């Protein structure tokens, strides 16, 4: 069985690199994109998990979640953003209600052990 594929979407390359490394520690193949254009060019539905920053310039993270839900995308999502936990939880609930498969949220700065546990749980 091949390793799950994870796509990290974050405009901060250092943060994206951390998320990629943590996903790899969790046994996944991982890639990162840093712009709205690169995200739109990626075949998101071919990934098992999307780690999504809601605040990428040129991209509305809430709209991305809505579109994933509306088209019944099979990709699971973890939201990682600098927003407060309450806002992230509300965004996740709204996205789930619209059909997106949001498996967890985390405020930045990420805690490596917690992110690894979220990734493992999302893919279980």
Give the location of each predicted region.
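Conserved acidic segment of CheY-like receiver
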Residues: 2-14, 19-23
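Acidic, metal-coordinating helix/loop segments flanking the phosphotransfer/catalytic sites
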Residues: 31-49
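Acidic catalytic/metal-coordinating carboxylates
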Residues: 34-35, 60-66
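His-Asp phosphorelay/catalytic-motif detector in bacterial-type signaling
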Residues: 46-48, 71-78, 101-102
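Active-site residues of response regulator receiver
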Residues: 53
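The feature encodes the CheY-like receiver
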Residues: 57
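Alpha4 helix (beta4-alpha4-beta5 surface) of REC/receiver domains from two-component response regulators
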Residues: 63, 83-105
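C-terminal output helix
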Residues: 86-87, 107-123
């Amino acid at each position: 069985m091949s390793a799950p594929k994870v796509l990290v979407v974050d405009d901060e390359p250092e943060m994206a690199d951390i998320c990629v490394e943590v996903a790899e520690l969790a046994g996944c193949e991982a890639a990162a994109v840093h712009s709205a254009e690169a995200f739109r060019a990626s075949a998101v539905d071919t990934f098992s998990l999307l780690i999504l920053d809601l605040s990428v310039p040129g991209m509305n993270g809430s709209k991305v979640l809505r579109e994933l839900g509306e088209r019944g995308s099979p990709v699971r999502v973890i939201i990682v953003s600098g927003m407060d936990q309450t806002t992230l939880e509300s965004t996740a609930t709204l996205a789930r209600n619209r059909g997106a498969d949001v498996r967890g949220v985390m405020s930045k700065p990420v805690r490596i052990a917690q992110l690894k546990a979220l990734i493992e749980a999302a893919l279980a």
